[in-house]
């Protein structure tokens, strides 16, 4: 039986991970569940998977969680201390599903503790942690396996094939909820319309990122670090059906594509069983049921957010600009979700923040967090002025 801990268990991806584990309950023992503030769901999850330990990041919710778990043997911890305790547990797999840059510090804790495998469903920690994160992972001999469908697809292709003669790595994107809308329609789009993704079941933040296509820029930077590939060998193509998740092209003209039904549980299953595979628990791909598969070049005029990743990878200060980009996006998306700015303002806030913030040296975790803090203040000020 394999042991596993889940960081971010109450989020959209975390709940899918729980579903996969429950469907294979004889194969996994859950050591720890970590959540931000959803105590009701965390307590329920702890009971159904028989977790040994739970951590709630919000220390003010300790008593409520304790009451909910009264009569069980579940250990309860809180805050940063609890996070470090959960990170230090000896487990076979850690599933990292915390949203945003909030995952970065726990990632450092996990890598520093020398966990065997981190299944990573968080791109922001890679974008902001950059080479510092991956250098530490190499030093500690920690395997980082991407859960996101696109990077998981590329990882699986490269795991079984030649890595030396790659000509291009292509990340696909569904195009999000607003693919076929024009700017006039986008100008007054509502939050509810934006988060209705046509293919994927996702959380609010990533649904907005998908709609702006900023998600593809984050993924381009993520791929740059995950696969140690130059930016000119990275590409994006829009594929609304979301059946092809990634393509690796080789110098001889051959291309290997990874296909599956658009279900995150497939990549979750792979990361939970890596380097092996478990039997399919969910719907399998039937290509005959698809009359056609569509591919198109991204419209960078309509969706300028898709350019950001490539532009940042061409700058002399990739690490700092990646942090500023990610932070500005987090602030802008939050403002849109709270109806403080319009949809089209999101990318404008990102570009304005990149123009106004300059973090010169990123040599440590504290440098990353300081740059994030500065960019957060500037982006917030920009949004205040828009109002």
Swiss-Prot record:
Biological pathway: Isoprenoid biosynthesis; isopentenyl diphosphate biosynthesis via DXP pathway; isopentenyl diphosphate from 1-deoxy-D-xylulose 5-phosphate: step 1/6
Coiled-coil stretches: none
Gene Ontology BP terms: isopentenyl diphosphate biosynthetic process, methylerythritol 4-phosphate pathway involved in terpenoid biosynthetic process
InterPro entries: DXP_reductoisomerase (IPR003821), DXP_reductoisomerase_C (IPR013644), DXP_reductoisomerase_N (IPR013512), DXPR_C (IPR026877), DXPR_C_sf (IPR036169), NAD(P)-bd_dom_sf (IPR036291)
Binding positions for NADPH per the UniProt entry: 10-11, 13, 38, 122, 124, 203
EC number: 1.1.1.267
Cofactor(s) the record lists: Mg(2+); Mn(2+)
Binding-site list for 1-deoxy-D-xylulose 5-phosphate: 123, 149-150, 174, 197, 210, 215-216, 219
Gene Ontology molecular function, alphabetical: 1-deoxy-D-xylulose-5-phosphate reductoisomerase activity; manganese ion binding; NADPH binding
Reactions the enzyme catalyzes: 2-C-methyl-D-erythritol 4-phosphate + NADP(+) = 1-deoxy-D-xylulose 5-phosphate + NADPH + H(+)
One Pfam family named in its UniProt record: DXPR_C
The entry's keywords: Isoprene biosynthesis, Manganese, Metal-binding, NADP, Oxidoreductase
Record: residues binding Mn(2+): 148, 150, 219
PANTHER family: 1-DEOXY-D-XYLULOSE 5-PHOSPHATE REDUCTOISOMERASE, 1-DEOXY-D-XYLULOSE 5-PHOSPHATE REDUCTOISOMERASE, CHLOROPLASTIC
Family (UniProt): Belongs to the DXR family.
Function as written in the Swiss-Prot or TrEMBL entry: Catalyzes the NADPH-dependent rearrangement and reduction of 1-deoxy-D-xylulose-5-phosphate (DXP) to 2-C-methyl-D-erythritol 4-phosphate (MEP).
UniProt-recorded name of the protein: 1-deoxy-D-xylulose 5-phosphate reductoisomerase
């Amino acid at each position: 039986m394999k042991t596993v801990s889940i960081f971010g268990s109450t989020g959209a991806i975390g709940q899918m991970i729980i579903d996969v584990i429950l469907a294979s309950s004889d194969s996994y023992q859950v050591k720890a569940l970590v959540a931000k503030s959803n105590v009701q769901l965390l307590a329920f999850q702890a009971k159904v998977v028989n977790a040994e330990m739970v951590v709630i990041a919000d220390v003010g919710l300790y008593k409520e969680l304790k009451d909910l778990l009264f009569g069980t043997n579940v250990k309860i911890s809180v805050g940063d201390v609890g996070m470090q305790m959960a990170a230090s547990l000896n487990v076979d797999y850690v599933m990292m599903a915390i949203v945003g840059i909030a995952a970065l510090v726990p990632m450092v804790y996990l890598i520093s503790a020398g966990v065997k495998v981190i299944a990573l469903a968080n791109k922001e920690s890679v974008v902001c942690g950059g080479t510092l994160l991956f250098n530490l992972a190499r030093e500690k001999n920690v395997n980082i396996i991407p859960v996101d469908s696109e990077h998981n697809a590329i990882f699986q292709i490269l795991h079984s094939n030649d890595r030396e003669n790659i000509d291009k790595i292509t990340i696909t994107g569904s195009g999000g909820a607003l693919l076929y809308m024009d700017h006039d329609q986008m100008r007054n789009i509502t939050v509810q319309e934006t988060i209705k993704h046509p293919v994927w079941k996702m959380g609010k933040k990533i649904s907005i990122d998908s709609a702006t296509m900023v998600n593809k820029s984050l993924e381009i930077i993520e791929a740059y670090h995950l696969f140690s590939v130059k930016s000119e060998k990275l590409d994006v193509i829009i594929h609304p059906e979301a059946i092809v998740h990634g393509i690796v092209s080789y110098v001889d003209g051959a291309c290997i594509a990874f296909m599956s039904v658009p279900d995150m549980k497939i990549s979750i299953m792979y990361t939970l069983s890596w380097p092996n595979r478990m039997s399919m628990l969910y719907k399998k791909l039937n290509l005959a049921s698809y009359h056609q598969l569509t591919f198109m070049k991204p419209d960078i005029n309509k969706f300028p957010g898709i350019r950001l990743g490539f532009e940042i990878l061409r700058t002399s200060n990739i690490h700092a600009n990646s942090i500023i980009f990610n932070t500005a996006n987090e602030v802008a998306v939050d403002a849109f979700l709270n109806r403080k700015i319009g949809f089209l303002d999101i990318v404008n806030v990102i570009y304005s923040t990149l123009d106004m913030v300059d973090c010169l040296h990123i040599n440590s975790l504290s440098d990353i967090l300081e740059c994030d803090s500065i960019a957060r203040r500037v982006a917030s000020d920009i949004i205040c002025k828009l109002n």
